[in-house]
Amino acid sequence: AKVGDNLAHHELDICDASKLAAIVQQAKPEIVLHLAAQALVRESYSDPLRTFSVNVMGTANVLDALRHCDSVRSIVVVTTDKVYANQEWIWPYRETDRLGGHDPYSASKTGTEIVVASYRSSFFAAKGVTVATARAGNVIGGGDWSADRIIPDAVRAWSANETLQVRRPQAVRPWQHVIEPLCAYLVLAERAWSDATAAKAWNFGPQTHEAATVREVVGIAQAAFGQGQVQWGDGKDGPHEAGLLMLDTSLAKSQLGVQSVF
């Protein structure tokens, strides 16, 4: 498709502020989507300092480099649905609900939100740069082979004729195909280009009634795979993970025209 013909590709650690700033000055971007992160909850327990370093200070480095770049007009920072102070209740969380973070990953992403809010009000607003955050539900899709992701874990286990270990089968999550939030990020970035009121947090995910338990998702995967043994846990072992999490996505639907399709 020759997609790469018009792309400049650089790989670097966002914790390296000087290299990051140099790349930004070289690229002179107009629209920025910031997705770099340490994105695994369980890894955040084993290495919390790296998680905070990448997600909080790494984001600060990105934003600080961008505030010195006059070409920038639209910035979308992707955080997570886990930034909310989870009450384990049946109501979906709205963008204005209280933030929190029981585990290091969630806390680091809440810190990201605070860093964004500070840079937005302190530096970007006066320059006419719109900075938004995107809070997406659990994503499923090709290319993700990270550990502790339910579908990749299932494929690895069943392909090797092994039993899939499921820690919390009754946990409820706002599952969505990866194409959905990616499209939403692009819509948000486009809106932020021309509309300063987009400078806020946005939830992206399925409708509330489409949220499903881990057991239900594994059942669908089993049917698609055609086989596969599962060992169901009771959620008592291992570090804390939220049991019930849903998002209110009515803001994105009403103001951006974004809603789940798949």
Per-range role (PLM):
Residues 1-31:
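N-terminal Rossmann/SDR dinucleotide-binding element
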Residues 2-9, 126-129, 226-229:
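A short helix-to-beta-strand connector/capping loop
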Residues 13, 158-262:
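C-terminal substrate-binding subdomain of Rossmann-fold SDR/epimerase-dehydratase oxidoreductases
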Residues 30, 42, 73:
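Conserved acidic residues
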Residues 35-39, 79-81:
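Conserved NAD(P)H cofactor-binding loop of Rossmann-fold oxidoreductase domains
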Residues 46-64, 68, 73-74, 83-139, ...:
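Catalytic helix-loop patch of NAD(P)-dependent Rossmann-fold dehydrogenases
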